[in-house]
């Protein structure tokens, strides 16, 4: 199979566990899902042959992931809300509290991620509004079979996905790519573990919307 000339989004759909591989190599398969594997690898000076070999191995492994290309869009929407929207509503307030504690207790340390709590608070506020608009406006349109008429709302949602992707870049910069320093306390380590989980969840969430739900809706499925 020719992997290098396929888009990251298409590969993430065809090979569900490719998302973990892409995340390990900092390959943006959600907001940047339209770029080819070759182009993305070249930008990061990654070995394209090694990536193709890893993808080939993943594709031959058995897996039990849901095939969302075949499921009705109403099922996909229900999954996105229960698995990602509801989860983000639980994750972010707790992450903000932990970040505030780390900055308050360790603010005198050079490794302290100053500004992290404020950035996470901004993500919480904007993502809360974003998910509300999806649940109250866009998703009902799609569920009523009006997805082909939803290009305007979809364009706005994709732009907001790009914006939160940029906010995640700031979080990574503040946290040394979400790596706790030597000697970090338990709260600090738990905070970074939670941030990593949130980033993984959010990237998979955006991938399902940008690369599966929205294109299928626009095709009138």
From Swiss-Prot:
Query: Which InterPro entries does the UniProt entry name for this protein?
Result: FeS-repair_YftE, Hemerythrin-like, RIC_family
> Please, which domain of life does this record's source organism belong to?
Bacteria
Q: Where in the cell is it found?
A: Cytoplasm
Name the Gene Ontology molecular function terms of this record: metal ion binding
One of the GO BP terms on file: response to oxidative stress
* A GO CC term assigned to this protein in UniProt: cytoplasm
Q: Where is the signal peptide?
A: none
Which Pfam family, just one, is annotated for this protein?
A: ScdA_N
The alphabetized UniProt keywords are: Cytoplasm, Iron, Metal-binding, Stress response
**NCBIfam families named among the record's database cross-references:** FeS_repair_RIC, PRK10992.1
Looking up HAMAP family in the UniProt record yields: RIC_YtfE
Complexes and interactors: Homodimer.
Role summary: Di-iron-containing protein involved in the repair of iron-sulfur clusters damaged by oxidative and nitrosative stress conditions.
Q: Which family does it belong to?
A: Belongs to the RIC family. YtfE subfamily.
Name of the protein in its database record = Iron-sulfur cluster repair protein YtfE
Species whose genome carries this gene: Yersinia pseudotuberculosis serotype O:1b (strain IP 31758)
